[in-house]
Structures are given as structure tokens and as C-alpha cells.
Amino acid sequence: APPQNYLWLQELRKVQELHWSLKDNGLDMFRLDGFVTYTVREPEGRLVSYDLYPPVIEESFEADGTVALIINDGMHRVYLARQEWVVPQVVYVRGVPKAFPYYAYPRPQGWEGLDLLAENPDRHTYLKKCHRIRHNKTLYRDFQAVFKNVGGSRSELNR
């Protein structure tokens, strides 16, 4: 289940372009065994490398006893896979101590009613996620500690 109430169309287009570019180079974004490093040219000409690993799905036990499968990382990729009728290879995380749940709740309605937005919404007027605790970043999974340039916005792909 997605934890986020929207997808950003600009990011979805970048993910789709990355999918096509990787495919042109013999790699399938939805069938990664491990991770791949790719390089993009920023608008000012600088080359920047990024790591890409499969989407991360985390098992989460909710208050009503439901076991939710939260998209921890890779929501735009999972959405694109759904649009292409592909079941993507994922990293499945289970056994997380109950004291350290994912920092936001899964959407009870799943993908239904998810907003596709042209602009990244203002956090003061739009609820991106329903956080579990006030200081939610204390529960954040920091993949940047292991991989290069992950979790941030991707630049336009070098063609």
C-alpha cells in the first residue's frame, strides 16, 4: 500500500524515462538483482551518478491487526509497473521491531483515489502522508547511508 497521497507527474515522467533508458542498455528496472549505478547530465552539464535498487516493500503491523505491505521506497516505480501490468521484483522487509514502524501509515484505500499532481504540493495546504508520530524523521529509513544519491529528485536523463 502506498503511504503517500499523491504522485508527482514530473517525477513519474523521470522514472519512465529512466526505465526506457535502462532498457536501451539491456537493463530492466523492474527485474533488478541488486542495484545499478547510472549517470545523468545535469542541466548545467555536470555528470552525477545515482544508485537504483528495487522498490522496498516493508511489512507493517497496524493497530487493527492488519499486516500492511507499505511501499517504503520506490512508489513512482511501483505505480509505473502497475500501469505496465508488470509485477516488479522488490526488496521485501519483514521482522522490523514494532518500536520502529515505517514513519507514515499506509493509505487505507491503497491506490484508489491517489492524486496525480503536476506540481509538488505545498506541505502547508496538502497532506502528503499521515505520519505516525510528531518527530517522524526519527523513524525514517536512510538508504543514503549505503547508496549514492537515492531518495531525492532525479535530474533529466542524459540521452
Functional labels for PLM-detected ranges:
Residues 66-159:
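Basic- and aromatic-enriched surface patches that contact anionic nucleotides/nucleic acids
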